[in-house]
Amino acid sequence: MPPPHLHGTIAATLTKRTMSESTPATPQQYVQQKAASSGSSFYYAFLFLPAQKRAAITAFYAFCREVDDVVDEVMDPGVAQTKLAWWQNEVRQAFAGKPSHPVLQALMPHAPAFGIEQRHLMAVIEGCQMDLQQTRYLDFAGLQRYCHLVAGVVGEVSARIFGQTQPQTTDYAHQLGLALQLTNIIRDVGEDAMRGRIYLPISDLQHFGVKASAILAREYSPEFVELMRYQAQRAHQYYDKALALLPAADRRAQKPGLMMASIYRTLLREIEQENFQVLHQRISLTPLRKFWLAWKVQALGAHRI
């Protein structure tokens, strides 16, 4: 852990980001820049939303990016833990009416209207803390817990913002969040291995006869391909579960989530067609293709996801 005097320094640095010359003038501009610069597929799903919903989901997404970046960009685990602790305190302050970081200044005005609660934001931070505390998951149940925090809860909040009238839509959102996260894990196996991380359950590696050392060394084998095919089949099952759970009454409002399903499931199929060559490259869709997939859901519905 960093020495005590760094706690104040880190907090001051995080807060001062709102004052730096490179930071946009308003919280709304800050979160818009954060969302657009990430290059994420989520950005394309936001484009078709009405202004208030787009502002709310953009602010929430920017919050998720901020805390996730702590794990991805801070090399010292002790400093990263301190930053996440700062974020926990910042969330508490924000729900007490005193946000200081621009992402929460942008998000909090929307929280009452869309039912965004303190527990939602804390869960996202808890998921990032899990990333710092472990680099392996023994079984799928353990991985599910992680996915619940970093993706299921995100799906739940997103569904509330998009427009939810049926309780079952929460179940849909959690299943879809899990499907999206499993797709991310499949896509990023090689990148994660470079950072010493393996999200694929160890029990699955053992079942297919794949050594963790082979993944960390980014070595392909027929066993690895079979392991990844199994992971893809599991992800497809969760896409199917999610789509089956979405009530007809909420289907129109939940189009942004269905856009994400279309984009990510198309990516998953691309990875399958590439025979899971994910250890040495990051397979992705072009921005134009992502926009086209999002537009098709907006214009034609989600019958072929």
What positions do the PLM features span?
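Catalytic cores of Mg2+-dependent Asp-rich isoprenoid enzymes
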Residues: I10, L14-L182, I186, G190-I305
